[in-house]
């Protein structure tokens, strides 16, 4: 903010968009691996370093939990672990990302899917900083009986669907798939 009228200028540092990120996977190990990818980008991606400076913190920089030099806290959490009470000093989680929470074993058990859906909606969503949290779940829809399928039916949830093949039969990720590879994969796996 800049007050000019009184010939006095006050400059505030820009407010961080994220203070405390929690990455959630189907297990603590998978969440730790996902968080490790973020950690590696902060350490070695020269574009990030050029734009934001070195982010490897001096204190705690370990697998599964670390704090970047800019003060942002990162934590890995496995499916079903209690997120209640998570905080870093005064900061509560304000960005939660769930990646590939569903697996084949879970999706075969309707009660477990229901229980994990409740855990996501109550415990995990409830751990967010009130009024400023962002909550994202990404994954493949591997079954109609899945946590992802249940959450897409929840009122107020914004759903983005990205299909591997566009309406013309072309792969959306052309750098990864040829048209033939994408069609062979779809023919084998099918569409859910």
State each model region's role.
Residues 20, 24-82:
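Conserved nucleotide-state-sensing and coupling region of NTP-binding domains
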């Amino acid at each position: 903010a800049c007050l000019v009228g009184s010939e006095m200028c006050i400059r505030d540092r820009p407010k961080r968009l994220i203070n405390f990120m929690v990455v959630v996977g189907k297990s603590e190990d998978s969440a730790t691996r996902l968080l490790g990818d973020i950690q590696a980008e902060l350490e070695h991606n020269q574009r990030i370093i050029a734009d934001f400076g070195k982010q490897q913190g001096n204190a705690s920089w370990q697998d599964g939990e670390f704090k970047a030099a800019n003060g942002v806290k990162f934590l890995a959490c496995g499916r079903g672990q209690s997120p209640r009470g998570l905080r870093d000093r005064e900061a509560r989680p304000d960005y939660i990302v769930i990646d590939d929470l569903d697996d084949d074993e879970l999706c075969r058990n309707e009660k477990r899917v229901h229980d994990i859906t409740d855990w996501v909606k109550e415990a995990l969503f409830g751990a967010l900083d009130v009024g400023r949290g962002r909550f994202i779940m990404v994954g493949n829809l591997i079954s109609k009986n899945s946590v992802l399928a249940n959450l897409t039916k929840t009122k107020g949830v914004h759903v983005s669907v990205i299909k591997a093949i566009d309406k013309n039969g072309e792969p959306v990720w052309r750098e990864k798939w040829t048209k033939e590879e994408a069609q062979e994969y779809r023919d084998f796996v099918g569409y859910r």
